[in-house]
């Protein structure tokens, strides 16, 4: 019997790679071979980190194409040109791959690789979108471009869209906010128009039925299918205890600073974990406020501050700029990278201060960890709304007049979910409930 082969066309960012690789593992277990199609930059980074040491599982192969940015897009680089080159070169590479490999029977693509769907359709290969944000966000975009733009643009704090919870403006995806350049809305519209090119288009969403039951059925034009949570088995159903990593880290974890060993020395539910993902970089003033807030809490913390490189390729560490770095290192631990799931699953973890990227949100739900939400852009603002109001697993910080977060606000929110009061108990009960439901979703 000939095995089927699915091609996963994946945008070269950690937030896209992690769920795509986890989906690939699920396909392999179901007897389907997988070709993972991404850029040379991502492939090289994945191949050079410890997560790749075990090698590829049988049935999984990688195909990398050069987008002209094999060392990645430099800070301050031309993002528009980068995406244009990615589309032109990626389309050509995919076209040639499908032409010369007739064993690919299906293409699943990231929404930032919408061109992959167009190429696949010209080759008469069926497609599905892998949506790596909540179904609610896809619904908001869909309704915005299909009759609800005026209502959303009006700036109301009671925006009611079909089958979705009431939204206020600050909870909309930032692409739809007035201050966002029009070109970003047009880009998203273009992605959805590609999806609309197929009758009853299939959308695979990193969510599960109990988490977003209404959003998954809100768009008649699409078939939304919850396939999540897309996280390694060891932290979810436990069927494969050895599966402790997504297997595609773009950044090397801090081997010299063993996070788990440090966590082992801390009491249960005592540690504050702080991480704002692989892309976001706060200005120095905001980092200082976060540091002040952590010190004011007086609780042990683990803070992931990613190393940055300047235009000359030299490493810069934000922690070195902090005026309170000495005090911070006495009270907590600062690392440049760590295995987030290992941290979230550790008994010492008490709460997660996060930017609310969707992968981080799904991981915190699956591990039963309360959240302090500090959303910045894209879907993060909507994710924070869902965490606080729909699922009740955390609290969202209040921004100051300058759009930042004061240290005292960080302290206030951390204490709300950790001080043992009524709010703490409610948030923890909800976190455990969703942890249980996430595991049941795999049944």
Swiss-Prot record:
Keyword Signal: yes
Domain of life the protein comes from: Eukaryota
Catalytic activity: an anthocyanidin 3-O-beta-D-glucoside + UDP-alpha-D-glucose = an anthocyanidin 3,5-di-O-beta-D-glucoside + UDP + 2 H(+)
Keywords: Glycosyltransferase, Signal, Transferase
Binding site for an anthocyanidin: 16
Top-rank EC class of the record's enzyme: transferase
E.C. numbers: 2.4.1.298
Signal is among the record's keywords: yes
InterPro entries, per the entry: UDP_glucos_trans, UDP_glycos_trans_CS
Signal peptide: 1-22
PROSITE patterns: UDPGT
TM spans (from-to): none
Annotated PANTHER family: GLUCOSYL/GLUCURONOSYL TRANSFERASES, UDP-GLYCOSYLTRANSFERASE 75B1
Stated role: Catalyzes the glucosylation at the O-5 position of anthocyanidin 3-glucosides to form anthocyanidin 3,5-di-O-glucosides using UDP-glucose as sugar donor. Anthocyanidin 3,5-di-O-glucosides are molecules that are responsible for pigmentation. Also acts on anthocyanidin 3-O-(6-O-malonylglucoside). Much less active with hydroxycinnamoylglucose derivatives. No activity in the absence of the 3-O-glucoside group.
Protein name: Anthocyanidin 3-O-glucoside 5-O-glucosyltransferase 2
Originating species: Perilla frutescens
Name of the gene: PF3R6
